[in-house]
Swiss-Prot record:
Main location: cytoplasm
Subunit structure: Homodimer.
Known role: Participates actively in the response to hyperosmotic and heat shock by preventing the aggregation of stress-denatured proteins and by disaggregating proteins, also in an autonomous, DnaK-independent fashion. Unfolded proteins bind initially to DnaJ; upon interaction with the DnaJ-bound protein, DnaK hydrolyzes its bound ATP, resulting in the formation of a stable complex. GrpE releases ADP from DnaK; ATP binding to DnaK triggers the release of the substrate protein, thus completing the reaction cycle.
Keywords per UniProt: Chaperone, Cytoplasm, DNA replication, Metal-binding, Repeat, Stress response, Zinc, Zinc-finger
InterPro entries with a match to the protein in the record: DnaJ, DnaJ_C, DnaJ_domain, DnaJ_domain_CS, HSP40/DnaJ_pept-bd, HSP_DnaJ_Cys-rich_dom, HSP_DnaJ_Cys-rich_dom_sf, J_dom_sf
Gene responsible for this protein: dnaJ
Zinc fingers, CR-type class: 136-214
Positions with a binding annotation for Zn(2+) 2: C166, C169, C188, C191
Name assigned to this protein: Chaperone protein DnaJ
Cofactor(s) needed for function: Zn(2+)
Length: 375
């Protein structure tokens, strides 16, 4: 069966540049990746074709040879026998090249000599109250993670034995092989890039050097921390494989909405409803603040809806600072409901006694509107 044209496989023109090739490959690889299409042989075949096409076209020399000779340029002395295919670990190498940054830097970059691998970073979501954000706290959390195996001390080898250098790659984790007119390097298919093999695996961790366990950790939440803040606990992530360094644990904080207060940076806002008569005649009321005290607010007569009163220093603490924000009281005026007959009579009498000076805003507004429409 004749091979499909590499350009057609990727859905690009022969004049496509490197950026267009990479973009086309990324979209197709994500669509047909085996993890998204388990047990789908057609998707697996398509994924291999996509990888093969991109491997050839991304290299200027290989692309030039293909443009000139077609598939014939790679049909002699290719890997895996006759067809110049991608036997062994080639697909993962290409996939890491494109998606390395998306997948934490790629496996090859996570490994060091001796097959050691850095552990994965972990994420833990924590929700706290506004009061806890105000005062700070120390929280105890339990995190399921991988820790270093205590039987083999992370080596992955059965006690009394040691890992050995891979005979295929001589401990380098990479092998070179001829493909057509070219010689390319790829991950060793025997040790999968680790450079070592474990003849006698540890009975507890089965050669991984780590086991799954739930750990208890203490997390310090500083006063003033905001919603969406990320706290990094270095070395508290997943244990590294075969003695590699541990990853980090990231605590992602969210602050619960408060019943009375809304936060904006270090400032707090509280909407307080007062009666119509209090707004007209003036008065006082107390508000509870997050520091556990009460503050008295004096409302002058004639206070309008939306009026703000500032309580200096009654807001949130500024993170890692001695400064604090302010608390703003926003006045809302409540219109009375379910009036008695006598209350209605008094309000009607009040309305009759009112003058333009009592309601300058509404009087002025309707006067301007009348002038606007009548000219």
């Amino acid at each position: 069966m004749a091979k499909a044209d590499f350009y057609e496989t990727l859905g690009v023109a022969k004049s496509a540049d490197e950026k267009e090739l990479k973009s086309a490959f990324r979209k197709l690889a994500m669509k047909y990746h085996p993890d998204k299409n388990p047990d789908d042989k057609d998707a697996e075949r398509k994924f291999k074709e996509i990888n093969e096409a991109y491997e050839m076209l991304k290299d200027p020399q290989k692309r030039a040879a293909y443009d000139r000779y077609g598939h014939a340029a790679f049909e002699h002395g290719g890997m895996g026998g006759g067809g110049g295919g991608f036997a062994g670990g080639g697909f993962s190498d290409i996939f890491e090249d494109i998606f390395g940054e998306m997948m934490g830097g790629g496996r090859a970059r996570q490994r060091s000599s001796g097959g050691r691998e850095r552990g994965a970073d972990l994420r833990y979501n924590m929700e706290i109250t506004l009061e806890e954000s105000f005062s700070g706290k120390t929280a105890q959390i339990r995190v399921p993670t991988s820790i270093t195996c205590d039987v083999c001390s992370g080596s992955g080898a059965k006690p009394g034995t040691q890992p050995k250098n891979c005979g295929t790659c001589q401990g380098t984790g990479r092998v070179r092989a001829a493909q057509g007119f070219f010689s390319i390097e790829r991950t060793c298919p025997t040790c999968h890039g680790r450079g070592q093999i474990i003849p006698d695996p540890c009975p507890k961790c089965h050669g991984q050097g780590r086991v799954t366990e739930e750990r208890s950790l203490s997390v310090n939440i500083p006063a003033g921390i905001e919603d969406g803040t990320r706290i990094r606990l270095q070395g508290e992530g997943e244990a590294g494989a075969r003695g590699g360094p541990a990853g980090d644990l990231y605590i992602f904080l969210s602050v619960k909405p408060h019943e009375f207060y809304q936060r904006d940076g270090a400032d707090l806002y509280c909407a307080v409803p007062i009666s119509m008569t209090t707004a007209a005649l003036g008065g006082t009321f107390d508000v509870a603040t997050l520091d556990g005290t009460k503050s008295r607010v004096t409302v002058p007569e004639g206070t309008q809806v939306g009026k703000q009163f500032r309580l200096k220093g009654k807001g949130m603490p500024v993170l890692r600072s001695v400064q604090t924000g302010d608390l703003y009281i926003q006045i809302q005026i409540e219109t009375p409901q379910k009036l008695t007959k006598r209350q209605r009579e008094l309000l009607q009498e009040f309305e009759q006694l009112s003058s333009k000076e009592n309601n300058p805003e509404s009087t002025g507004f309707f006067a301007r509107m009348k002038e606007f429409f009548e000219g």
